[in-house]
């Protein structure tokens, strides 16, 4: 249920970005006087995208960020039950707070970025928040239930901040004619990560983290090592976000400028 909620939140975010992209493409086509001409796929566009440093930074940030959220949510409820002693009847509700936060806050943050900009800085902030969340979850002695809930709320804020800044940033890095291809390549790389990281975490849990058996005979796990892995991935996302901000200054992507120019 939690994964479905997160996917639903992500679909809402991408739907908003799709509508914005459609308007941008229509405006660009009218300005160029080519609104009636059909855009054709070109392998040259793929080459141009792949040699653009901004593509790899956005793609890496995307895969690292989402790899810290979606795979974690698969066992968030059990983490709350086992480590924090939260009742299993409400653990799923608390674990679903990031999805609820994304639904409410993404339009708010998106509106701020449209008017004020600061996309690169917001991606930095969201990545730093991820580090804090997973690092505190990884500390064995911090097991008070209220801490777990506060961390879920912070995760929800981060899950709203980064996508609301990251997806519109793609439209600043690439010309309109390359946007569809760029998004497709980014989603392709993202899906590789969303396959690989859960596979890694599942292997680590079964190999090193079994702490006992439940009454029904299934395994109980100590999630310290997986949370350390997520913390490491979040640290990598922060490094990539820093590099993206540096690239923004070097290549003039204008990520810090508002999306809507007056």
Where would I find each of the regions flagged by the language model?
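Single conserved hydrophobic/aromatic residue that forms the stacking wall/gate
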Residues: 1-8, 13
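Helix-to-loop junctions at the C-terminal end of transmembrane segments
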Residues: 105-118, 205
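Multi-pass alpha-helical transporter architecture, strongest
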Residues: 14, 223-262
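Juxtamembrane intracellular "pre-TM" segments in multi-pass secondary transporters
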Residues: 20-58, 260-262
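Extracytoplasmic gate region of multi-pass secondary transporters
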Residues: 52-103, 163, 167, 197-198
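C-terminal transmembrane helical hairpin of 12-TM major facilitator-type secondary transporters
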Residues: 119-166
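A late C-terminal transmembrane helix in Major Facilitator Superfamily
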Residues: 173-210
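A membrane-interface helix-boundary motif in multi-pass transporters
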Residues: 203-234
């Amino acid at each position: 249920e939690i994964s479905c909620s997160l996917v639903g939140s992500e679909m809402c975010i991408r739907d908003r970005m799709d509508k914005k992209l459609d308007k941008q493409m229509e405006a660009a086509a009218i300005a160029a006087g080519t609104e009636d001409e059909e855009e054709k796929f070109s392998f040259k566009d793929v080459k141009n995208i792949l040699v653009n440093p901004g593509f790899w930074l956005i793609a890496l940030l995307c895969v690292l960020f989402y790899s810290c959220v979606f795979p974690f949510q698969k066992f968030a409820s059990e983490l709350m039950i086992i480590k924090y002693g939260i009742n299993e009847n409400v653990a799923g509700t608390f674990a679903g707070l990031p999805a609820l936060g994304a639904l409410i806050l993404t339009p708010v943050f998106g509106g701020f970025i449209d008017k004020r900009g600061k996309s690169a800085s917001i991606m930095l902030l969201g990545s730093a928040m991820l580090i804090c969340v997973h690092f505190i979850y990884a500390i064995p002695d911090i097991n008070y239930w209220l801490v777990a809930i506060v961390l879920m709320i912070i995760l929800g804020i981060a899950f709203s901040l980064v996508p609301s800044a990251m997806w519109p940033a793609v439209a600043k890095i690439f010309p309109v004619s390359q946007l569809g291809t760029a998004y497709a390549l980014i989603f392709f790389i993202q899906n590789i990560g969303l396959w690989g990281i859960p596979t890694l975490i599942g292997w680590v849990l079964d190999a090193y983290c079994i702490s006992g058996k439940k009454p029904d005979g299934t395994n109980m796990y100590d999630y310290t090592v997986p949370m350390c892995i997520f913390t490491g991935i979040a640290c990598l996302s922060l490094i990539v976000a820093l590099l993206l901000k540096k690239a923004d200054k070097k290549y003039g992507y204008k990520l810090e400028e508002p999306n809507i120019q007056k």
